[in-house]
Amino acid sequence: GVDSGYNRIFCIIDMDTKDKEPELSQYQKLKKKYAEPISKPKKGIYCKVEFFETHRCTELFFLYYFRYTSRPYENQEQLLNDLNQCVVYKKANEFFRKGLHSYFERNNGSLDNAVANAERSMAEKQKDGREYTYSELGRLMTLLKEL
């Protein structure tokens, strides 16, 4: 991480594991620790750590490839059911290794739609104060394009 010489670290956080104590306090403490960039000039270290949250889980961003939702999900299984109505999805390592992005696009999904839907979820979250069904991964994708 920081000591390895990276100047930026992006952390993708599933908020369904951070909405209760003690995990919530631990996560808030971690975000506070990295709120400012790590700067140790004598060691040649400068690193900005950024957090990108999705509530309930990253699979929401995958669903956003296909359609928008602001539905509150009680658990991950409900979200996975909605995703599986759009495309066959299995939460397994071998599935992830095959290139999810191209798989979603071959099945009529779109990264541009996912980014737009994620941005919409964040705009609604800020406007309404909603604390569920949102993703900051659209902002991450935009940042990655700029690198």
Question: Where are the language model's segments positioned?
Answer:
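C-terminal accessory helical subdomains adjacent to catalytic cores in phosphodiester-
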Residues: 2-8, 15-147
